[in-house]
């Protein structure tokens, strides 16, 4: 037997031994350090490398898959929020505002004209999502199937999938390409080959793998009523809007190609269409300074003109080939020192209200490509440690989610209460309803309800209408057909939140109708609650009889 063959035989022997020891530990209710176990068994058997997690998962007998796979799951945080997120990228294309500003944003590293020529706009091509997209030659079907297979091999459930469409301004691409891209995302879940977006959505609705939502990255100038309407047809439920700064002078100096006033108008239109709105912000931009940075985040969370549902924080990075790189090289721009940046991020996180979710705290760009800027690969952890030191708390949605709390703090909720928070934002009345354990500050499920303003452009939402912009019960992904008493999805919290939303809409908003912006794969859930398809929404007429 050649060397490769003997190593394969040793690998099989090692995997069998590891699985046997894991089963013994499970039966004896003992905890095991898997990395240490892999190292010891591989060394004992003379294996020159440690077996991969995928190999161990494949070696688990069918009888033990249900009990061992949750313990073996790689990066459990990937599905801790109850959803398997699949990020996909559209083909490389030029930034749309080049036509009227003459250039891209000063800090933007990617795109077809950049040093990273096979990358999409604002990406280098070396981020994990970019590399998967390049391997698949930006084919949406191959990107989706590849990522789903990867997640399944690592022990994750892919019963509920949320797509994030990345790679620049997707809505600036030609309509036929956009239709092709979205059609293939839905077809990758259903296995059907569709001729149109409508057909793809119809099959996706009945698929075993449910598309519970699509998130699209866009800009204020590509978030007009016609764009909002197209995205509804795709099954999009959340928008990520690149804003970067709330200061008009900074938007102008960094060559954003839009005004902050247009950002506020976009937020208003998007929320009146039912979308969840996530904002991208960049601390440490040129000509801002520490105090102005703190003030803009205070304004972001407190001013009714903004108040986003989610936030992605991308501290400014200096990358070769950008306008900012030239400013930095000639001494006209200097990044914050690492300790100052950590302090700033800690301050920002302490300002986040309990109805906002912080999705990211830094870019995925590999550190060797960064000339100046973030020096820590785990900036969020450093900021959280600083907050603990200063006695500050981060109360954003992600920090308080039950799934995240279980992973990081081994804490489970005990006394669960219905909690309500009301605020005004973007011309409408917002109500954030949640089931929480207030004593331990753990969040189990949430619902975002909005009384639509009179500026709504959709016919389905005109008049006295309330809209549910988000319903989410947290905890590890549970198959739609299963009920696991230790997990919080499918335990009835969702229907209780919907009942309360209907009561508020009927009695306080005095609405005649309640609509839900629903992911394609969750429409059946709302049908069971008495909702009917109403254009792209699921709607229900509210009257006195529905109060029973």
Swiss-Prot record:
Q: Share an example GO biological-process annotation for this protein.
A: oocyte development
Name the top EC class: transferase
Q: In which pathway does it act?
A: tRNA modification; 5-methoxycarbonylmethyl-2-thiouridine-tRNA biosynthesis
Which residues are recorded as binding acetyl-CoA? 160, 470-473, 493-495, 526
SUPFAM superfamilies in alphabetical order: Acyl-CoA N-acyltransferases (Nat) (SSF55729), Radical SAM enzymes (SSF102114)
Tell me its EC number(s), please: 2.3.1.311
Assembly behavior: Component of the elongator complex.
Family to which this protein belongs: Belongs to the ELP3 family.
Function description: Catalytic tRNA acetyltransferase subunit of the elongator complex, which is required for multiple tRNA modifications, including mcm5U (5-methoxycarbonylmethyl uridine), mcm5s2U (5-methoxycarbonylmethyl-2-thiouridine), and ncm5U (5-carbamoylmethyl uridine). In the elongator complex, acts as a tRNA uridine(34) acetyltransferase by mediating formation of carboxymethyluridine in the wobble base at position 34 in tRNAs.
Put simply, this protein is called: Elongator complex protein 3
Q: Which gene encodes it?
A: elpc-3
């Amino acid at each position: 037997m050649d060397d490769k063959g003997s190593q394969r035989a040793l690998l099989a022997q090692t995997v069998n031994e590891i699985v046997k020891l894991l089963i013994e530990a499970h039966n004896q209710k003992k905890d095991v350090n898997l990395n240490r176990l892999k190292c010891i068994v591989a060394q004992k058997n003379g294996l020159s490398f440690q077996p991969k997690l995928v190999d161990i998962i494949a070696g688990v007998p069918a009888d033990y898959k249900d009990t061992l796979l949750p313990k073996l799951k790689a990066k459990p945080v990937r599905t801790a929020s109850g959803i398997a997120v699949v990020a996909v990228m559209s083909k490389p294309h030029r930034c749309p505002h080049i036509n009227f500003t003459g250039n891209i944003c000063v800090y933007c590293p990617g795109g077809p004209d950049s040093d990273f020529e096979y990358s999409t706009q604002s990406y280098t091509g070396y981020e994990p999502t970019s590399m998967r997209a390049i391997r698949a030659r930006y084919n949406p079907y191959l990107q989706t199937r590849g990522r789903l297979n990867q997640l399944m091999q690592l022990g994750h459930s892919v019963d509920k999938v949320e797509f994030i469409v990345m790679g620049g301004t997707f809505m600036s691409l030609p309509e036929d390409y956009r239709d092709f891209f979205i059609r293939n995302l839905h077809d990758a879940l259903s296995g059907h080959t569709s001729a149109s977006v409508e057909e793809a959505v119809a099959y996706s609705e009945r698929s075993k793998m449910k598309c519970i939502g699509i998130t699209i990255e866009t800009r204020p100038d590509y978030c007009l009523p016609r764009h909002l309407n197209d995205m509804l047809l795709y099954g999009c439920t959340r928008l990520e809007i690149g804003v970067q700064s709330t200061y008009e002078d900074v938007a102008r100096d960094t060559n954003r190609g839009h005004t902050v006033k247009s950002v506020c108008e976009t937020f208003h239109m998007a929320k009146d269409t039912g979308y969840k709105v996530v904002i991208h912000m960049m601390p440490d931009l040129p000509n801002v300074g520490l105090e102005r940075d703190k003030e803009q985040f205070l304004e972001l969370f407190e001013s009714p003109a903004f108040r986003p549902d989610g936030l992605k924080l991308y501290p400014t990075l200096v990358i070769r080939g950008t306008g900012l790189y030239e400013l930095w090289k000639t001494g006209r721009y200097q990044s914050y020192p690492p300790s100052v940046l950590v302090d700033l991020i800690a301050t920002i996180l302490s300002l986040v209200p309990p109805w906002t979710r912080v999705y990211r705290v830094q870019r995925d760009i590999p550190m060797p490509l960064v000339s100046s800027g973030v020096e820590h690969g785990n900036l969020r952890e450093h900021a959280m440690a600083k907050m603990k030191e200063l006695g500050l708390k981060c109360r954003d949605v992600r920090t308080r989610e039950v799934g995240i709390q279980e992973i990081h703090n081994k804490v489970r909720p005990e006394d669960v209460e219905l909690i309500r928070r009301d605020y005004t934002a973007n011309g409408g009345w917002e109500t954030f309803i949640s089931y929480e354990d207030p004593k331990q500050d753990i969040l189990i499920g949430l619902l975002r309800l909005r009384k639509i303003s009179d500026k709504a452009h959709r016919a389905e939402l005109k008049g006295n209408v309330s809209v549910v912009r988000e319903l989410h019960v947290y905890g590890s992904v549970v198959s739609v057909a299963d009920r696991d008493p230790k997990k919080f999805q499918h335990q009835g919290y969702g229907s209780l939140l919907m009942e309360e939303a209907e009561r508020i809409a009927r009695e306080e908003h005095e609405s005649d109708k309640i609509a839900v912006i629903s992911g394609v794969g969750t429409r059946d859930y709302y049908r069971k609650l008495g909702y009917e398809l109403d254009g792209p929404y699921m709607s229900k007429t509210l009257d006195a009889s529905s109060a029973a």
